């Protein structure tokens, strides 16, 4: 039998899709890229913003038209968690609904017509699953926690993924070793608040923290690089930043989700820190790792965001000069504090602010790219670049998270670490040549 999976949203959903495949493989399901021949079609959904949620029902309609007569459609993930049986009412072609915390139950629900499994209680089977043998990957995703205990006013995740729980370290290390044996060179650790690891386990566990986990993972032979997402700025204390700086296998790029540069808006968002506190953490980090790459998330148009609040955000953008920016207009979500507020920033104002923010960030990237010319980086080869069946180079990322295109005629295999020198740039893109010894 064949299964087709459509994955929407974040890296956590991508990992959940791997979990679904792992469970279904026990029932002899094989993945296919063609929904027309699938016996089972799964849509793994995102509900962080409204747009992907609207897209879900469009996708269901399209799949219902092209699927085999007896094929089943299942909706999984975060939208499944918060909409539950309402999905079945709105889309009768859906056979079952499976929440984000219930992926391990897929083998049960596919045999139950109109089943709804969306509980967000603790469940070790939500993360303890057999390693899914697949084509070797240079970069692999690895969950270290599930759920979230934060109460950000705009975020639906605690409602869809439940309370935060750390995965036992021995299970993480075992999975990482399997990934390394399967060819993985770079791990991407996943969690809603990865650097809060160790605060709660589902059973008795030795006291450990995120830095302890990073140190243990660094000892695994074959793993060359470790990245993680998404950390919370509140847990970036001096001890964590110092150990982050010292560990040679931990990539010197980090996600620091700002959300807003206004202390007033941050307070309304229930983020737990101020603009000044955030900038202090950045200053400390750059003192330890001057070349660190920093990415961030910014929401514009949050309820009651004034012109002054937005200017504060622009000020932080100028001071930090983020290497990567994920920016969005505020999207009201159900089951959130802010979703019930009546105050709204006019949509045209939000679009104007977003455009200004993104345009300035593009300029910053170009300014930073100019300064990279002549600098040396070590790139993990991800893909070869070919033209007319001839090798023209490769592409990959530096330790600091910079995406680099390398021009060369030599064959370099994915997974190799290669020293390169930046020779030019174009619209923020970095172009390099192999650095001689």
Swiss-Prot record:
Q: What class of enzyme is it?
A: transferase
What gene name is given for the protein in this entry?
miaB
Q: Which CDD domains match?
A: Radical_SAM
Q: Name one GO molecular function term.
A: metal ion binding
Which InterPro entries does this UniProt record tie to the protein? Answer: Elp3/MiaA/NifB-like_rSAM, Methylthiotransferase, Methylthiotransferase_CS, Methylthiotransferase_N, Methylthiotransferase_N_sf, MiaB_methiolase, rSAM, rSAM_horseshoe
Q: Which family does it belong to?
A: Belongs to the methylthiotransferase family. MiaB subfamily.
UniProt keyword Translocase, yes or no: no
Binding of [4Fe-4S] cluster 1 occurs at 10, 46, 78
In terms of NCBIfam families, this protein maps to: miaB-methiolase (TIGR01574), MiaB/RimO family radical SAM methylthiotransferase (TIGR00089)
Q: Which residues are listed for [4Fe-4S] cluster 2 binding in this entry?
A: 148, 152, 155
- The EC designation for this entry is 2.8.4.3
Keyword field: 4Fe-4S, Cytoplasm, Iron, Iron-sulfur, Metal-binding, S-adenosyl-L-methionine, Transferase, tRNA processing
Described function:
Catalyzes the methylthiolation of N6-(dimethylallyl)adenosine (i(6)A), leading to the formation of 2-methylthio-N6-(dimethylallyl)adenosine (ms(2)i(6)A) at position 37 in tRNAs that read codons beginning with uridine.
All copies of the MTTase N-terminal domain together span 1-115
Indicate the quaternary assembly. Answer: Monomer.
**Cofactor binding description:** Binds 2 [4Fe-4S] clusters. One cluster is coordinated with 3 cysteines and an exchangeable S-adenosyl-L-methionine.
Entry's localization field: Cytoplasm
What region holds the TRAM domain? 370-436
User: Which cofactors?
Assistant: [4Fe-4S] cluster
Q: Which domain of life is it from?
A: Bacteria
Q: What name has this protein been given in UniProt?
A: tRNA-2-methylthio-N(6)-dimethylallyladenosine synthase
Q: Give start and end of each Radical SAM core domain.
A: 134-367
What reaction does this enzyme carry out catalytically? N(6)-dimethylallyladenosine(37) in tRNA + (sulfur carrier)-SH + AH2 + 2 S-adenosyl-L-methionine = 2-methylsulfanyl-N(6)-dimethylallyladenosine(37) in tRNA + (sulfur carrier)-H + 5'-deoxyadenosine + L-methionine + A + S-adenosyl-L-homocysteine + 2 H(+)
């Amino acid at each position: 039998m064949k299964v087709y999976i459509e994955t929407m949203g974040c890296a956590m959903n991508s990992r959940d899709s791997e979990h679904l495949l792992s469970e279904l493989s026990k029932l002899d399901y094989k993945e296919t890229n063609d929904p027309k021949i699938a016996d089972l079609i799964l849509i793994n959904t995102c509900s962080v913003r409204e747009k992907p949620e609207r897209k879900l029902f469009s996708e269901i309609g399209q799949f219902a038209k092209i699927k085999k007569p007896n094929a089943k459609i299942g909706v999984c993930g975060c939208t499944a968690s918060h909409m539950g049986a309402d999905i079945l009412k709105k889309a009768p072609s859906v056979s079952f609904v499976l929440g984000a915390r219930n992926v391990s139950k897929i083998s049960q629900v596919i045999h139950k017509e109109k089943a709804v499994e969306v509980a967000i209680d603790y469940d070790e089977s939500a993360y303890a699953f057999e390693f899914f043998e697949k084509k070797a990957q240079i970069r692999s995703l690895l969950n270290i926690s599930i759920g979230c205990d934060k109460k950000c006013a705009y975020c639906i995740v605690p409602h869809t993924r439940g309370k935060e729980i750390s995965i036992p370290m021995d299970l993480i290390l075992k999975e990482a070793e399997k990934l390394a044996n399967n060819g993985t060179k770079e791990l991407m650790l996943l969690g809603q608040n990865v650097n809060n690891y160790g605060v709660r386990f589902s059973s008795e566990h030795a006291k450990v923290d995120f830095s302890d986990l990073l140190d243990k993972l660094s000892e695994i032979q074959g793993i060359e690089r470790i990245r993680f997402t998404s950390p919370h700025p509140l847990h970036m204390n001096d001890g964590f930043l110092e150990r982050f700086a010292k560990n040679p296998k931990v990539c010197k790029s980090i996600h620091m989700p700002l959300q807003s540069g206004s202390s007033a808006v941050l307070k309304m968002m229930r983020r737990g820190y101020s603009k000044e506190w955030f900038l202090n953490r950045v200053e400390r980090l750059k003192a330890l790792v001057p070349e660190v790459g920093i990415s961030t998330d910014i929401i514009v148009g949050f309820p009651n965001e004034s012109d002054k609040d937005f200017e504060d955000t622009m000020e932080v953008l100028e001071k930090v000069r983020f290497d990567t920016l994920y920016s969005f207009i505020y999207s009201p979500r159900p089951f959130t504090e802010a979703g019930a507020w009546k105050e709204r920033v006019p949509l045209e104002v939000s679009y104007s602010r977003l455009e200004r923010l993104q345009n300035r960030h593009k300029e910053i990237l170009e300014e930073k790219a100019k300064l990279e010319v002549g600098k040396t980086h070590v790139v993990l080869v991800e893909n070869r670049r070919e033209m007319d069946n001839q090798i023209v180079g490769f592409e990959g990322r530096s330790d600091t998270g910079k995406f680099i295109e390398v021009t060369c005629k030599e064959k370099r295999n994915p997974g190799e670490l290669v020293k390169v020198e930046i020779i030019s740039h174009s619209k923020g893109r970095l172009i390099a040549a192999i650095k001689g010894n």
